[in-house]
Amino acid sequence: MKEEIAATVVFLTMLVKKHKQLSKQKIEKFAAKLTTLLFAKYKTHWYAENPTKGQAFRCIRINECQALDAVLEKACTESNVDFNELGLPKEMTIWVDPFEVCCRYGEKNDPFTIASFKGKDGYNAPKRISNAVEKATSDYHSGTSSDEEPTNKEPKTIPKVSNPNSIYQCADYTQAIPSWSQYPRRKNYQNDGYPHQPMPYYPQQKPYKAFRRSASTFSGPRVDRYHWVNMKR
């Protein structure tokens, strides 16, 4: 555990030195506080026989969308250092596991090894840490963070259609959509907000007139359908 924590602290302090915002004394004080805090945190969550166990607990994560890592925040407070002065990347993840320390810059880059203590690899730890710092710096400038990726990848303009008779022409879509403010607002109505419905209109019809016989009409008995008998004669 001692070697893994030392490699982690050296890696972070080398990144801080590249930022050139803190004095040598402040960097050394921050490194000492960070080492002490990591020892206190990892001593009950270190499993050499199963390195992946407790990996999430030992992970050091920096992300603008999440709260600041508790260990880094406390190390800054106890060393009287502003976290922003460290110059660490906006997104970075460090896995401190038995026999190996890995890092990833951003969310889209591949992880890389900071230091490995498996067999003879431990003898090359200082060189590997230095190479990891250089690789991390290059990945930081070339990688894309999760909050910087464009959310809309659709084309902004509609491509032209070669067929002149096609209804899908670019000119049909260039007119601006009218704003809703150009239309009159809906009137408010009383009585629970519902407007009075007008009564249906039906055209007036002429009243039916019953047929009346005129005075000149014969009132006598009918001989047949074509002849009437006048009884007054």
From Swiss-Prot:
Q: Which InterPro entries match?
A: Anti_prolifrtn (IPR002087), BTG (IPR033332), BTG-like_sf (IPR036054)
Identify the stretch annotated as signal peptide in this record. Answer: none
Would you tell me the Gene Ontology cellular component terms? cytoplasm; nucleus
One Pfam family from the record = BTG
The UniProt entry's sequence similarity note says: Belongs to the BTG family.
Q: Which organism is it from?
A: Xenopus laevis (African clawed frog)
Q: Where is this region: Disordered?
A: 135-165
Superkingdom per UniProt: Eukaryota
What this protein is called in its record is Maternal B9.15 protein
**What PROSITE patterns does its record include?**
BTG_1 (PS00960), BTG_2 (PS01203)
